[in-house]
Amino acid sequence: MSLFLQLILLVVGFVMLIKGADWFVEGASKIASKFGIPQIVIGLTIVAMGTSAPEAAVSITAALKGSAEITIGNVVGSNILNILLILGITSVIIPLSVKKNTLNIEIPFVIIVTAILAFLGLKDGTISRLDGIILWLMFIAFLVYLFILSKKGIDTDADDVPELEEGDTVFKLLILIVVGGALIIWGSDVTVNAATAIARSFGWSERLIGLTIVAFGTSLPELITSVTAGIKGKSDIAVGNIVGSNIFNILFVVGTTAIITPVVYASGFKIDSIVCIATAALLFISVFLGKDKKLTNNGGIVMLISFGAYFMYLLRG
């Protein structure tokens, strides 16, 4: 199959993943609302996990196909890209406010879980099922933390639940769930197959394709959400969404994947893991030292320069 066709299939796969996740979340959330499940529970489970569905589907599919470098590359690459590129672009457009709990708790937590992921993976070269359970226990603890914040009236994903509309029958919503789920599964298969073929065509490693193209594709929803929030003046949402996404990527995506099938964590990810930890630390320092505890334009420029340097390192490596 030609390289051009594989590139088209990769784009199609990304579209299927993103649209499938949207439909699945909408259908599942609205059905849950119909059955009287509290908004806060829907927001912290269906909505929050659904937004990480593209990363999870690609990572699980890649691991099952024996392409573990795409699995880890997707997560590590997405987390680096989310901060350096997405927050970099957004903060250059408009300085980003950061909530107190995000600066004091969530960003440090990102640094901690990123370091834990690197330790678990590099200690013996595998994220085992036991490691996956450990990550999931931490994920549950994070959900409890978000639940407590929401009960205190602090904005979280619990506020992003789709509202029921006239004509939202159970049958219609079930179709959204089934079609959305099918698109996620099919889209992940198309994406992984196309990404693997492209890597072979260019003589690239699956690690490189996972850290770059696949990571960028699965991070598109975060890019759109953050830039839109910044432009609309809801800048505090932008940083919160990215930080939450990075935590979910490690604890939910890698944790779930490892429980299903142990994931090989190649030694080649050592530098990338260090960069991922440093990236989260850079976010903390940039906000902590920023005027009025904001991620300023200067901070955004530093992040974009850092992303450019890392990208050049990947291409040369």
Predicted segments with their positions:
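Hydrophobic alpha-helical segments, chiefly the membrane-spanning helices
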Residues: 1-317
